[in-house]
């Protein structure tokens, strides 16, 4: 960046997307300040790296900032945003700052409604283990680096591309991955067709020497292909895909399969993550690595060290006879594949605890939610996590639970809060169960509390 930019201020610096960019900038030598509503592990890490963080939002937090970065969650009436405008300090979205970092490197951007974080993490791990040493900005904590960001010395930057508000169009990667396209963020987009058009624009932003890596299993991605004007390769389960998986074996958290490229067997890959959706994520990472001419043997070896991402089918407790797992899945499509992974890898009764995320999403996807949980043997639905939204009349978790029961689920229960859920779980959980917490809010805390109780009990 131009030398006169010294201090960069982040409003909402504790967010998973914001904190990664802030960490990279700190490691590049910039002064980074920020604000957030509460102390967290993320804000503490940034403070340890030299960040200056205030808690609560106030005009005086800006200090001597040269530029202010905001996330999509920050509203225009935020006092720090108002103060920045008053002082004529540039206010830019998170994606614009990420685009500036990407401009200094060769960018690899992973987009899609689901699977972005895991796929980005897999790509980052393979490139790092192959000596490429990329800069990494991910929307989740990658266990192998202990963070969601890393400043590398190599010439590539691997980033998760957030489509939620269309701002990923600010990025200019040379490799663009699209895992899938689904109806989500309908508080911003008018409908699925608009989402698909935005993804076409994203893909076609790659330069003439770049490549798009597209999931052929997803019908909405298939529908984009005739409009793609740049070179692309595909991946999926079908032999019609350039990269495909054969001879898949699921054994608890370990999934093993053979990778094929246009009919040629490249070799076997083993990943420590369950489910067909993670096979697809791994195929995308293989495709990226092969574009960078990394030999398949090195790719397979790198996957041996991939130990997952925080809140993506993350084991919280493995006792004598009960297992507790947490997952970020909060969209009907994500819920279905996560439950399928739990069923395919383990011969256990699945007890799912779901916390709906946002009133707008619950309302827009209600019909999809009521049929998404059929693979859960026992289901608990708790109150909606607002994520800053104002409640919408008639949009209630209780009605969602009733809708799920009305569509044939024979064992669904509504428990409004964490206390009620904890009491219910202690009553119903039995030997052989896999307890799965699902949602993008704070439902993970219920899993941790249950794990602590089980540990004391055992």
Curated annotation (Swiss-Prot):
Catalytic activity, EC: 6.3.2.8
BP term (GO), one: cell division
GO MF, one annotated term: UDP-N-acetylmuramate-L-alanine ligase activity
Organism: Syntrophotalea carbinolica (strain DSM 2380 / NBRC 103641 / GraBd1) (Pelobacter carbinolicus)
GO terms under cellular component: cytoplasm
Keywords attached to this entry: ATP-binding, Cell cycle, Cell division, Cell shape, Cell wall biogenesis/degradation, Cytoplasm, Ligase, Nucleotide-binding, Peptidoglycan synthesis
NCBIfam families: murC (TIGR01082)
InterPro entries, A to Z: Mur-like_cat_sf (IPR036565), Mur_ligase_C (IPR004101), Mur_ligase_C_dom_sf (IPR036615), Mur_ligase_cen (IPR013221), Mur_ligase_N (IPR000713), MurCDEF_pg_biosynth (IPR050061), UDP-N-AcMur_Ala_ligase_MurC (IPR005758)
Protein name, per record: UDP-N-acetylmuramate--L-alanine ligase
Protein location: Cytoplasm
Catalyzed reaction equations: UDP-N-acetyl-alpha-D-muramate + L-alanine + ATP = UDP-N-acetyl-alpha-D-muramoyl-L-alanine + ADP + phosphate + H(+)
Residues engaged in binding ATP: 112-118
Pathway(s): Cell wall biogenesis; peptidoglycan biosynthesis
């Amino acid at each position: 960046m131009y030398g006169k930019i010294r201090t960069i201020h982040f409003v909402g610096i504790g967010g998973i997307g914001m904190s990664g960019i802030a960490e990279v900038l700190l490691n590049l030598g910039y002064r980074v300040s920020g604000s957030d509503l509460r102390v967290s592990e993320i804000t503490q890490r940034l403070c340890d790296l030299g960040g200056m963080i205030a808690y609560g939002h106030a005009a005086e937090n800006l200090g001597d900032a040269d530029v202010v970065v905001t996330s999509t969650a920050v509203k225009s009436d935020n006092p720090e945003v108002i103060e920045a405008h008053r002082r004529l300090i540039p206010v830019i979205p998170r994606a614009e700052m990420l685009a500036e970092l990407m401009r200094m490197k060769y960018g690899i951007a992973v987009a899609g409604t689901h699977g972005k974080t895991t796929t980005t993490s897999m790509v980052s791990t393979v490139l790092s283990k192959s000596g490429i040493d990329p800069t990494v900005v991910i929307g989740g904590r990658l266990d192998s680096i202990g963070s969601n960001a890393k400043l590398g010395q190599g010439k590539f930057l691997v980033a998760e591309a957030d489509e939620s508000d269309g701002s990923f169009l600010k990025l200019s990667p040379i490799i663009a991955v699209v895992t899938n396209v689904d109806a989500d963020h309908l508080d911003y987009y008018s409908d699925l067709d608009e989402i698909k058009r935005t993804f076409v624009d994203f893909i076609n932003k790659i330069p003439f020497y770049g490549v798009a890596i597209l999931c052929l299993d997803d019908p909405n991605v298939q529908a984009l292909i005739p409009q793609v004007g740049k070179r692309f390769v595909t991946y999926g389960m079908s032999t019609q895909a350039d990269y495909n998986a054969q001879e898949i074996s699921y054994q608890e958290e370990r999934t093993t399969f053979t990778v094929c490229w246009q009919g040629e067997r490249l070799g076997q890959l083993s990943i420590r993550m369950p489910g067909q959706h993670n096979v697809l994520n791994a195929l995308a990472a293989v495709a990226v690595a092969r574009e960078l001419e990394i030999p398949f043997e090195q790719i397979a070896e790198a996957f041996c060290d991939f130990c997952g991402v925080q809140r993506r089918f993350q084991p919280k407790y493995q006792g004598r006879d009960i297992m507790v797992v947490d997952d970020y899945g909060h969209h009907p499509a994500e819920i279905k594949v996560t439950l399928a992974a739990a069923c395919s890898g383990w011969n256990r009764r699945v007890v799912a605890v779901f916390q709906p995320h946002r009133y707008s999403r619950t309302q827009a996807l209600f019909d999809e939610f009521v049929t998404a949980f059929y693979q859960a043997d026992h289901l608990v639905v708790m109150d909606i996590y607002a994520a800053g939204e104002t409640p919408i009349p008639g949009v209630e978790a209780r009605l969602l639970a009733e809708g799920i029961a009305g569509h044939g689920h024979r064992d669904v229960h509504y428990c409004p809060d964490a206390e009620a859920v904890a009491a219910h779980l202690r009553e119903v959980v039995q030997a052989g169960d896999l307890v799965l917490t699902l949602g993008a809010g704070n439902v993970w805390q219920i899993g941790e509390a249950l794990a602590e109780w089980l540990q004391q009990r055992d």
